[in-house]
């Protein structure tokens, strides 16, 4: 669990589907259901980060570590896939700042297990650019 010093924000990381409470939202790519599917699939390790403020869910993001099972030498690199930039459940919050907090949190969390973190299907390629750069991400076409 991480508590952001800038606001009364609490980031909770879930590693087991049985620990995840029922959460609001309708984005399948950041849902408990997809977490459970990945959890039941060999070679995949899902991690779910939920941002709350005073018991209210503000945002959630599902990241998935994919273990490389290839027998080719030097292909033992694990990679992390993230689809989009998460789901935001409160329109009054600064989504980009909240994304920056979640990005910093899970980058530290995941970098121990995955050598590559890739964001896919970004709706707006400039969303969170400042936070990507401050966490040492770089764009690739």
In which residue ranges do the predicted regions lie?
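N-acyltransferase acceptor-side catalytic subdomain
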Residues: 1-141
């Amino acid at each position: 669990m991480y508590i952001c010093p800038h606001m009364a924000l609490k980031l909770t990381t879930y590693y087991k589907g049985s620990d995840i409470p029922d959460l609001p939202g309708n984005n399948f790519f950041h849902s408990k259901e997809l977490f459970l599917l990945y959890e039941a699939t060999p070679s995949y390790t899902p991690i779910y980060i939920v941002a709350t403020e005073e018991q209210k869910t503000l945002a959630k993001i599902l990241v998935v570590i994919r273990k490389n099972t290839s027998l080719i030498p030097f292909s033992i690199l694990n990679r992390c896939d993230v689809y989009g930039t998460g789901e935001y459940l409160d329109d009054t919050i600064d989504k980009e700042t909240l994304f920056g907090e979640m990005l910093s949190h899970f980058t530290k969390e995941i970098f121990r297990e995955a050598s590559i973190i890739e964001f896919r299907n970004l709706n707006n390629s400039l969303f969170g650019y400042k936070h990507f750069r401050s966490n040492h991400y770089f764009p690739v076409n």
